[in-house]
């Protein structure tokens, strides 16, 4: 039998191995797990082979915090609160909070550069590329808006290009584009408003105290540039935004023993002591807000244009400032300079630190004018007529205010009429400051009992007085300032009501007088309490004493009988102590040179850490060493200790 022949058709060739198609795999079902019996436990099925499914993770959005929030967190940490609780309240990790604490100087600097309430709302510290042009345009804008002049975008852009040519020269390629103008608006928080109608022409002369709202003008774009502060005509000041300043006279190194003229008893004229110690009298300006939480540095005004003890020293480190006046009085230029150089920057820093609106008002009582004998330039007057107090002595409120009107001065009414409003600080705060100052002065005198009162007066310099004035002002409690504000403002509403804290103030005054009497008894054995009380209230007139403008002879040193009994008792013991065998005793010149070297080193340190006590004691030792060694006073000491 023959095999069957193949069917007709093309011959089938075997497919190469590399061209063969893969054999399809059969998808086998996963084995079923047996049903659990009554005594067995169910196990979860094993995970299926292959990649695991991805789980969607919800991303947290990054939150940008404003400078105001950062400063609030910083103040809470500096106030003693734990960092963990602050982080929990703000919802930030600990590293972010520590970064804010590290960048605090940068945040403060940025607010100083930008200023205003808008700066605290910024989330990025980014200034303009052309800072000079930006500041010039903003200052020009505030000046015109204060006078009610409407401004449009093209006008501001043209003025910016004009400022650029003035600052960088005519070859400047700066272009005030629409983008620059938009960023400038956002940077300073200036909004655009469209107004209609017709505006009145601006009033010639200085800007009025109460700015009237602008009348509608022709259709145009009005830029309202008061987002940071409300107009001062709207009021709305908080307790921490209301300040008061008052001046007082002070004999800064007069001791109780020098108050009375030796050997004259009660025949001394009333103004004799004032004329004798006129060169030691200064005027002190004190300022604080209503709550007492912000007390500015005291301003001391003296008759020395360049005190030797203040040379080569940075006065910014002292707790009090010093200014020169020929009659030691707060003149108009001094008040204006203090307002713009110290008061306005200090108040704005405090308001930014407290996250408050950038506006404040300063209430100033017209201080009593100097005596007619004082050499001050004035109008023609008769010889027998004393000078009357004139309001223009210190300037007008229009001049004492910032360009935007946010910080300004208001003068309280004077006179014996019912409209008279006494200054709040006159109700015990100024007296408390002077009592504290004289108490610290007596403590220094008692600590330097090894020398005479004249040695102490030569050792106690004006630099020590500035430190002592700042220390005494810091000792005045905030509650006392707030209570005196209530007593002072009550006269405007309840003229006949008696103070509620009169008994408490009398008790405090009695305790202070007792302390001063005790300290005076330690230094002066023959001093009566009445003489201490007279010395305590010697400069309570508030102004310059009569006769200070006259030329007076320098006061003679006190007689030996009036000196404390403990003074000069140890000179013989010191002479006996020098006769020591085998010990090389230094000469008086070497001792003075070593003490002066130590004094120069001590004066170069921070005055807040050193304090006036160590300096006065060391100067007293130098004076005593010169007197014992028969050495004349040095060139630095020839300026009568100032």
Swiss-Prot record:
Molecular function, one GO term: DNA binding
Matches recorded under InterPro entries: CenT-Element_Derived (IPR050863), DDE_SF_endonuclease_dom (IPR004875), Homeodomain-like_sf (IPR009057), HTH_CenpB_DNA-bd_dom (IPR006600), HTH_Psq (IPR007889), WH-like_DNA-bd_sf (IPR036388)
Region (Disordered): 1-54, 198-230, 543-583
Feature: DNA-binding region: 83-103, 154-187
Positions of the HTH CENPB-type domain: 121-194
Keywords tagged on the record: DNA-binding, Nucleus
Top-rank lineage group of the source organism: Eukaryota
Database matches in PROSITE patterns: HTH_CENPB, HTH_PSQ
Domain DDE-1, chain residue ranges per copy: 239-364
CC terms in the record's Gene Ontology section: nucleus
Gene3D superfamilies: Homeodomain-like (1.10.10.60), Winged helix-like DNA-binding domain superfamily/Winged helix DNA-binding domain (1.10.10.10)
Main location: nucleus
The family this protein is said to belong to: Belongs to the tigger transposable element derived protein family.
Protein's recorded name: Tigger transposable element derived 5
GN (gene name): Tigd5
